[in-house]
């Protein structure tokens, strides 16, 4: 089936869609023929993407505000007459820090965005999705399953998103609504760049991120977008699924360890582009 017809005539809401993974997902659904609602607090970024993507509209929404979420869904159904898919992508990754340096208030705020925002949109969208026998795709993360050094609040909130996905999949199966999640690994996005800039050595942080995957590079937002379109369309017998889009990082054997076992190294002064494989030299 041609990519432009895979989800033709369907209506998709993508939160946190103004940039990064969310923008990649929005682009992929537009390419598949869907009508896409770009949802974000960032009006400038959302409007810019709306101008870029034919078949997309921007609606400003803060997913931590239930009244905003209600308005988002009401406006979407009023404009398009239906709702077929919701992608809960809005979220944040705070800077890494030891647990003793975190605060309960900061944790609560992260829960409001990463978990309760997803919960609220799911709850309010289900009446529409039951009518269309649609589906929800929640964006979790690899570290929700394997943990993250000095990233306890983030890993905890995203791990809860995965658990929420599985529980909702059971509840909604009686209505023919599927609920799945995607757990990305290192995806090269503006957020990744911002977090790397906070590291003592940003170039080394980027290199380490790229080398964490057996495929030897970071992923791209378009690759997460392709996974989302697959879950919404062809994956009609999948529900409660956690789909890892990680370059194999969860296997625990990135190329740096492999090259070392062969007596090779990544050229230390060379930081490869995050989405391409690095140059290799000999230790000898």
Curated annotation (Swiss-Prot):
Enzyme Commission (EC) number: 1.1.1.122
Gene Ontology cellular-component terms listed: cytosol
pH-dependence of activity, as noted: Optimum pH is 8.5 to 10.0.
UniProt GO MF annotations: D-threo-aldose 1-dehydrogenase activity; estradiol 17-beta-dehydrogenase [NAD(P)+] activity; identical protein binding
Hydrolase listed as a keyword: no
Organism superkingdom: Eukaryota
Keywords recorded for this protein, A-Z: Carbohydrate metabolism, Fucose metabolism, NAD, Oxidoreductase
Cysteine disulfide links: none
Record: residues binding NAD(+): 19, 21, 40-41, 62-63, 89, 154, 158, 187, 189, 191
Descriptive protein name: L-fucose dehydrogenase
The organism's taxonomic lineage, starting at the top: Eukaryota, Metazoa, Chordata, Craniata, Vertebrata
Gene that encodes it: HSD17B14
């Amino acid at each position: 089936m041609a990519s432009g017809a895979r989800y033709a005539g369907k209506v998709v809401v993508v939160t946190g869609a103004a940039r990064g993974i969310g923008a990649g997902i929005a682009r992929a659904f537009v390419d598949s023929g869907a009508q896409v609602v770009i949802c974000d607090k960032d009006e400038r970024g959302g409007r810019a993407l709306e101008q870029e993507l034919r078949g997309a509209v921007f609606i400003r929404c803060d997913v931590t505000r239930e009244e905003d979420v209600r308005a988002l869904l009401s406006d979407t159904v009023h404009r398009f007459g239906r709702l077929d898919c919701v992608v809960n992508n809005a979220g944040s990754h705070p800077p890494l820090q030891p647990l003793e340096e975190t605060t309960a208030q900061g944790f609560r705020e992260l829960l409001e965005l990463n978990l309760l925002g997803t919960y609220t949109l799911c709850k309010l969208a289900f009446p529409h999705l039951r009518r269309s026998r649609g589906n929800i795709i929640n964006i979790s993360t690899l570290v929700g399953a394997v943990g993250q050094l000095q990233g306890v609040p983030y890993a905890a909130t995203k791990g809860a998103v995965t658990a929420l996905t599985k529980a909702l999949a059971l509840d909604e199966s009686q209505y023919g609504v599927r609920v799945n999640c995607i757990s990305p690994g290192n995806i090269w996005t503006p957020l990744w760049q911002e977090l790397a800039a906070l590291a003592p050595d940003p170039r080394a942080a980027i290199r380490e991120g790229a080398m964490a995957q057996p495929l030897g590079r970071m992923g791209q937002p378009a690759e997460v977008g392709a996974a989302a379109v697959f879950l919404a369309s062809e994956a009609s017998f999948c529900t409660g699924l956690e789909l890892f889009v990680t370059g194999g990082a969860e296997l625990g054997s990135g190329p740096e360890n492999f090259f070392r076992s062969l007596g090779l190294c990544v050229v230390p002064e060379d930081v490869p582009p995050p989405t391409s494989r690095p140059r290799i030299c000999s230790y000898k």
